[in-house]
Amino acid sequence: MRHGKKINHLSRQTGHRKAMLANMACSLIEHKRINTTVAKAKALKQFVEPLITKSKEDTTHNRRIVFAYLRSKYAVTDLFRDVAAKVGDRPGGYTRIIKVGNRLGDNADMAMIELVDFNELYNGGKKEVKKAKSRRGGKAKKAEGTAPEAPAAESESTTEASE
C-alpha cells in the first residue's frame, strides 16, 4: 500500500525521473523560464525550490548538497551567484507556474514555469509608448510657426554679443 506517498512518478523509473528533473532544473536556472507539461512543472517546483533556499547561504556544504541534485557545476555556480542574490530577501515561492494551453500533438496541458524575480528579462524591453495622434495638416502649421522664431532669437543674441 502506498499510504502517504505523495510523489508524482511521472510514469518513469527513479533514475530517469531524477535525471529529468535535474536537467529541467539546470535549464530553468540557465534560462530563467521554460515550457513543459503541467505535471512536470509541478514536480520541478517541488524539486528546485529547496535548492534555491539552500543557495541563499553560500557555504561549501550547501554547494555540495545542491551539486548532488543538479550534477552541473555551471548551474550550481549560476544558482549561487545570480539567483541567490536576487531571491535573498524572499522567504519562499521562487517559481511561478502559468498554464499556456494544450499541446497540438497529444493535447497535453502545457505550462510555463519561471523564476519570479527574473521577470524583467522578458518584460523589460516591451514598454509601450503611446504616440500622439495628429492630423495630416498639423505638422505643416507647427513647422511654419516655429521657423520665424528661431532666427529672431539668434539675431537678438548676436546683437547682445556685439555690444
UniProtKB/Swiss-Prot annotation:
GO terms for molecular function: structural constituent of ribosome. The keyword Magnesium does not apply. Gene3D superfamilies: Ribosomal protein L17. Coiled coil: none annotated. Residues 127-163 are annotated as: Disordered. PROSITE patterns: RIBOSOMAL_L17. GO terms for cellular component: cytosolic large ribosomal subunit. Residues 145-163 have a biased composition (Low complexity). SUPFAM superfamilies: Prokaryotic ribosomal protein L17 (SSF64263). Keywords: Ribonucleoprotein, Ribosomal protein. Residues 128-140 have a biased composition (Basic residues). Transmembrane segments: none annotated. InterPro entries: Ribosomal_bL17 (IPR000456), Ribosomal_bL17_CS (IPR047859), Ribosomal_bL17_sf (IPR036373). Pfam families: Ribosomal_L17. GO terms for biological process: translation. Belongs to the bacterial ribosomal protein bL17 family. Part of the 50S ribosomal subunit. Contacts protein L32. This is Large ribosomal subunit protein bL17. It comes from Flavobacterium johnsoniae (strain ATCC 17061 / DSM 2064 / JCM 8514 / BCRC 14874 / CCUG 350202 / NBRC 14942 / NCIMB 11054 / UW101) (Cytophaga johnsonae). The lineage of its organism: Bacteria, Pseudomonadati, Bacteroidota, Flavobacteriia, Flavobacteriales. The gene is rplQ.
